[in-house]
Amino acid sequence: MKLNKLALVLGLGLSVVAGSALAADQGHGTVKFVGSIIDAPCSITPDTENQTVPLGQISTAALKDGGRSNSRDFKISLENCTTETYKTVQTTFTGSEATEVLEGSLGIEGIAKNAAVVITDAGGKQIKLGTPSAAQNLRDGNNDLNFAAYLQGSASEAAVPGDFTAIATFALTYQ
């Protein structure tokens, strides 16, 4: 009888250990939290801090003789803004300039050639690289800074088909 009880206890103990071992390997992972603290009256939302704006597949016919694609809207969203000290914000875009296409435009890299990305304000006015946008009023809470971009063809050379990328960085200046 003692032997049966001992076997029962050992059997139960082994099943608990075996079950725990199986349960421990049913999935695991890591959650990494990243960010930065900035000295500014607004926070930039994570989904608009680094973004991709798809310009689409643009025909060479649309870019002929300095033609352009349709504009694609994008925005930089600010949250938790306070206007105690600063009332406006300007945005400055920088990147590799394509002066041969249009002064202040963003050069493209890749197989495609003879075109450039033009960044505009919400009203369609070009924001030249390295030049601050017009000041936009801030309000307490959340704010969207609205922009657009399009692909501009060269007026002197035919656009070369192929994939391209163009990367601009932005900096905000509060007044």
From Swiss-Prot:
Keywords: Disulfide bond, Fimbrium, Signal. It is found in: Fimbrium. Its main location: other. The keyword Signal applies. Residues 1-23 form the signal peptide. Major structural component of mannose-resistant/proteus-like fimbriae of P.mirabilis. Belongs to the fimbrial protein family. This is Major MR/P fimbria protein. The gene is mrpA.
